[in-house]
């Protein structure tokens, strides 16, 4: 019925009963640029993430980070976050657990606002891993760096193709 469709409320414009988060999560979920730390053309997580971004149709700027390559899948590759022409909104850290905290510190220093970490070996492994995870938590809390992880297989915002 045409008349019913015209007068039914549009759910997208209604005020949500859910409280808004005090955190601005756009750098994680709608980034204009993404750095992929540990990018590689040779398989593994760094290759899969880049290919998934291409398949999804991500239209933002992609910065593969790996000092071993000049280009990966048509994207110019950079040695580190410090070498980027502009800070990335988000960084995906696809390295081992011992590299995660130093990369979070580098990301924060480079102006990155959000980081996704794909590494295991934290609280799920016991004492030392739990202590590493606590240091990551403390750093992100103190610095204001948004962090999804550790040990996160990733996420996708299908609407915005990120």
Regions found by a protein language model. Name each.
Residues 1, 9-162:
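Catalytic-core regions of core metabolic enzymes
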């Amino acid at each position: 019925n045409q008349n019913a469709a015209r007068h039914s409320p549009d759910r997208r414009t209604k005020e949500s009963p859910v409280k808004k988060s005090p955190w601005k999560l756009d750098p994680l979920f709608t980034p204009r640029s993404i750095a992929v730390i540990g990018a590689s053309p040779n398989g593994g997580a760094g290759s899969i993430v880049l290919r998934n971004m291409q398949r999804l149709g991500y239209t933002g700027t992609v910065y593969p980070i790996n000092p071993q390559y000049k280009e990966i899948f048509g994207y110019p590759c950079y040695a580190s976050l410090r070498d980027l022409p502009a800070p990335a909104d988000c960084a995906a850290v696809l390295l081992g657990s011992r590299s995660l905290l130093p990369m979070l510190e580098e990301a924060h220093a480079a102006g990155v606002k959000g980081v996704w970490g794909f590494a295991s070996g934290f609280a799920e492994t016991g004492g030392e891993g739990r202590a590493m995870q606590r240091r990551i938590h403390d750093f992100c809390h103190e610095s204001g760096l948004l962090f999804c992880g550790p040990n996160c297989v990733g996420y996708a915002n299908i609407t915005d193709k990120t």
